[in-house]
């Protein structure tokens, strides 16, 4: 499975990963869904391509717009369950299954959506945006940590930091995946 997780081509411009327009659309969609308590899970790829998880969903190749994201996560629509994966300012897949975190230190009140957001951030360098169906709060995960109830400004700041990531971080993403996989394999006896 490790072979399906491929680092981005480092010769690409860093700003190709996420633009100001994409950041604005993600934030607008997240807080619009939060107002009406529509649950959402949006995974923003960084250095590690999440091909393994992308394949579990329905392939898309769409420019990101807040209207499209809101429609994807609308209750009782074919695409509303699972996660959306964003790569290079495009939605590449919807209804994706993600690994759930088995971290016992996570708050027991967190549901499957939040545990999946933490789970993918434990095995990759992706950032996930989570909208709670229960509370409408917007949270994000990164590096196995969850920040609950973030403001639009804090989310914008975090997303902006992704545009200027240094190339030397690529190896830490691979190391995190290997560590996560090894931990999982050890527990399951594979």
Residue ranges and their predicted role:
Residues 1-190:
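Divalent-cation
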